């Protein structure tokens, strides 16, 4: 569920957020909030991890720097995943693409950590290969079919 879009628009009501926090997050294998969503979920990584989901990937794509840092927490163990920022406006749907790729790698039999790292690599390559493709107006999609 997307709570807050990349453009900063809140897409889920406060009541919807509270329902998600209390009822859905404890059932999830992993949650993948972006930084604005993480700020809604809690004031610290520890607070977010206390919501009942064993794995959290906080996505740092909103950072305004050359190297973007995502934070992956698996059963309390924290790792940073760093990727070079690609200069493109074709970033529409990157969060959904990343979470779908994680699910696909899990379905292929990879463990959680390997699935997250493989999905991160896939997304980075999809963004890079689609950086200069012009599709319509505004933020375009990544290139899902780069291989």
Predicted features, each with a name:
Residues 88-112:
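Short, small-residue alpha-helix embedded
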Residues 33, 49-50, 98-100, 107, ...:
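Internal alpha/beta core interface subdomains
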Residues 78-92:
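Short pre-catalytic strand/loop immediately N-terminal to key active-site residues, enriched for Gly-Thr
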Residues 1-3:
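A short, structured active-site edge motif that brings together acidic residues
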Residues 78-80, 105-119:
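Phosphate-handling active-site elements
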Residues 13-78:
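Conserved phosphate/ATP/ADP-binding segment of small-molecule kinases
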Residues 113-147:
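Charged C-terminal helix
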Residues 5-7:
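Conserved beta-loop-beta/alpha segment of the NTase-like Rossmann-fold superfamily
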